[in-house]
Amino acid sequence: MIQLQALSKKFNKKVIFEDVTLVFEPNKSYALVGQSGSGKSTLLNAIGRLEKPTSGAITLDNRNIWDIKEKTFFKRYLGYVFQNYALLDHQTVLDNLKIVNRDRAQIKAVLEQVGLDQSYLKAKIFELSGGQAQRVTIARMALKEKKVILADEPTGALDDKTGSEIIDILLGMVSANTYVIIATHDPKVYSRVDEVIDITQL
């Protein structure tokens, strides 16, 4: 499980969140909700070791995440879906996916899982729609079989239909060995997860 123990984050004198204690279990999906500026993205980044908390601890399977080697944590454990995709725009879909897994059969299988056929392999990222690029991001993460899947406003730049399909894919990744945590303010997203956590109430 993932445990947040008395977690606090401050920027200068501004308190982003304070004394947060939470438990996340595998085989469940979670949404961190709250209005813009409430700190949900900062909390998500702390769980993903992208921002260090001011105080408190985060453990993954009883191990402090900051005690795990940085390369090991990001390579083996963390999968992150950003609103801006975090892909190499001028490289092809295949090039982006081969960075993490060079097995063509696995690449094709994962692309199908996210709703893209083989014709997209030679397309460059900048040629894709927002929804298609987001699918490639998720495909790349699936190829690495990540344990902790974090998504920060993954539908923010997408139309309702595409956004719903992206959430379908993310929720389909929930398993006995996987954590799926989504930061969102969209009720169409958080109404579909197993547990909603309002960060303003912590």
Report residues per predicted region.
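Conserved structural motif at the start of ABC-family nucleotide-binding domains
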Residues: I2, F17-D19
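Helix-to-loop junction immediately C-terminal to a conserved catalytic motif
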Residues: G48
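Conserved ABC transporter NBD signature motif
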Residues: G56-W66
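ABC ATPase NBD coupling module
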Residues: I65-G79, S175
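Conserved ABC ATPase "signature" region
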Residues: R104-Y120
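Conserved ABC ATPase signature
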Residues: K124-L128, Q132-Q134
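Catalytic Walker B motif of ABC-type/P-loop ATPase nucleotide-binding domains
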Residues: I149-D152
